Amino acid sequence: MVSRRQRPGSGQSEQWVLLAPESLSDDAKNLSDKTIFAKLRAPCTDKGSMFLFIDSGQQICEVKAFHEEYRSWFIGQTVQQDGRLLIATPIDPMFLVLHYLIKADKEQGKFQPVEQIVVDEEFPSCSMLLQCTPVSKSLHHVTEEKEIGSKKFYKYSKEKTLVWLKKKVELTVKVLKSSNICVGGGVQSATFIRNTQGSDVKEEDYTRYAHGLISEYLTEDLREDLSKYLGLPDLSSPTPEPPVKKRKVSEAPVEAEEDYTKFNSDSKNKKSNSKMTAAQKSLAKVDKSGMKNISAFFSPKAKATK
């Protein structure tokens, strides 16, 4: 689908090619204030990232851009110079709110209205997260709640958050298995299909893979806490190998059990004992008297005495 945005000060609109959920199709046909692009703080990097609010925040998508040099799009009878492909992936907005809950707990450590917790001067659009229905329904999974009159107050709960994240990991594992996604140490590329998928992949491999996917939306401390909570061993420290068994060394001299010298023989005796060929036998019978060795013809002549 093609997304459009009006350029300020001109009647021309800016376009992108966007892969997005079907729920965005109606808003794409007609310009609507219900669909908004907003820059929010990414929990993993603590930097700004682009998100898409669909239907007034009923669904939130993370927007990633696939970009290659010298790429354009042909749209109708025009050429779209911006050749990027934007991909909008649905995300649970609680991952974005969780960052502010943890921060407020470290700084104040007390119950507060959620409107005072989700505040960011650098990314003021974060207040839009509170309008999302999934956030209001899921706050109790990661916080302790207090209600005074008609007002609710919240405080981050690490224990409840780990339980909630573990369920997320378990659901992700089910999707990985049902989708036949290759996991484990033997996988070098997600595009490779491994025939022995079921034989050498352990449950721990699925859990570790799912933990890695979920961790892309968590702070570093929470990633480590979740890994310990799931019982995943630390791969940075290698598993100690069992000690090598030492062989007993005897002080008694080593003696040969067999006399190997009997196999030794003089090479000359071997030659004499070897059988002679028919040509050699005939040559031996020839009378060699008066014959000279061939080397005698090449030796220097002796000087005659005067």
Swiss-Prot record:
Domain of life according to the entry: Eukaryota
Q: Which Pfam families match?
A: RNase_H2-Ydr279, Ydr279_N
**Would the keyword Nucleus turn up in this protein's UniProt record?**
yes
The principal localisation class reads nucleus
Subcellular location, record wording: Nucleus
Composition bias (Basic and acidic residues) maps to: 259-269
Q: Name one GO cellular component term.
A: ribonuclease H2 complex
Biological process according to GO: RNA catabolic process
Renumbered to this chain, region (Disordered) spans 232-285
The record's keywords, sorted A to Z, are:
Nucleus
> Does the record's keyword annotation contain Cell cycle?
no
Q: How does it assemble?
A: The RNase H2 complex is a heterotrimer composed of the catalytic subunit rnaseh2a and the non-catalytic subunits rnaseh2b and rnaseh2c.
The UniProt family comment states:
Belongs to the RNase H2 subunit B family.
Q: What job does the chain carry out?
A: Non catalytic subunit of RNase H2, an endonuclease that specifically degrades the RNA of RNA:DNA hybrids. Participates in DNA replication, possibly by mediating the removal of lagging-strand Okazaki fragment RNA primers during DNA replication. Mediates the excision of single ribonucleotides from DNA:RNA duplexes.
- Protein name per Swiss-Prot or TrEMBL: Ribonuclease H2 subunit B
Originating organism: Xenopus tropicalis
Which gene produces this protein?
rnaseh2b
